[in-house]
Amino acid sequence: MMNEEPTIDRKRNDDPMTSALTRASAVTRRAVLTGIAATGATALGACTSSAQLTDIRGDYSGEIKFDSYDTSAGTYEPATRKHRAKNTPKPVKPANIDNKTVAGIYSALGHYAAAITYAINTGEDTCIQQVNMEEAGKKGVYEYFGKPFTKAWVGESKCVFILKDPLPTKKDDTYTWPCTTKITIGEFAVSDGRARDISSDKREITDDAEMHLTYKDNKWVISTDALFFSSATSGTNKV
C-alpha cells in the first residue's frame, strides 16, 4: 500500500527498499562509520595522550560542520515521491584535509560523513571513492550505504559525526576520536514505483563509536577492519 511503512526484517531481502534500510541501520555499528582499526593493527592501549598536533581552535567537539561542495551540476532538487534527488552537490576535499593538524583530521572526517550522505541520496560511489581509506574499506562502505539505493531511494537523508571530545588522543601512530554517529533518513522511501512513508520515530539512527586515523603518505587515512561487515548486521535496527 502507498502509506505502508518499510518493514525492517533481516529474514526478507526480496524488497530493495527493505534491504536498503536494513543495511543503513545495521551499519551504524561502530566499524563502518568510524573505521575501527585496520586489519592486524595493534589494539589501543589504556594509556593515551592528547594529540601532538597543531590546532587553532582548541575545542572541536560537537557536530562536524562541512561546507566544501561542488555545485556545478546545476540547481539541486531534493528527492520526491516521484523522482530521486537531482544535481546533488558533491563533497570535495577541503584545502586543509591533508595537513598534519587537528583541523586536517576534522576535515577528513567531515568529508567522510558527507561522502556517505551523497551515497545514500544518489546510490553512487563517486564520492566514497575520494575518501582517504583503504580500497577494501571504501568498497564495504559503498556496499552498505550506496548500492542499496541504486534501485530505490529515500527522502533527503544525512549522515553526521558528533565529536565527544575537544581533541583526539594519540597512541603510537593512531589518533582516536570518540563520537556519536547519526543518520537521519527522509520522510519517505520509494522502490518498484511505490512510495511509503517512514514514521518520525523511525527516521534517526545513532550509535556511539570511535574514529581511528593515521597519517600516511602525507595524508590522513581512516582505518577500517575488513571483518566488521558481518558483525555489523547484528546491530539493532531503528528505522
Predicted regions: what is each one?
Residues T150-K170:
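A short, amphipathic edge element
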Residues T80-E156:
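Core segments of small alpha/beta cavity-forming domains
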Residues R23, I36, A41, C47-G104:
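Juxtamembrane and targeting peptides
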Residues R30-A31, T48, V160:
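Secreted/luminal cysteine- and crosslink-motif detector
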Residues M17-R23, A51-D67, K170-V239:
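Exposed beta-sheet edge and beta->alpha loop/turn motif
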Residues M1-V27, G35-L44:
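N-terminal secretory signal peptides
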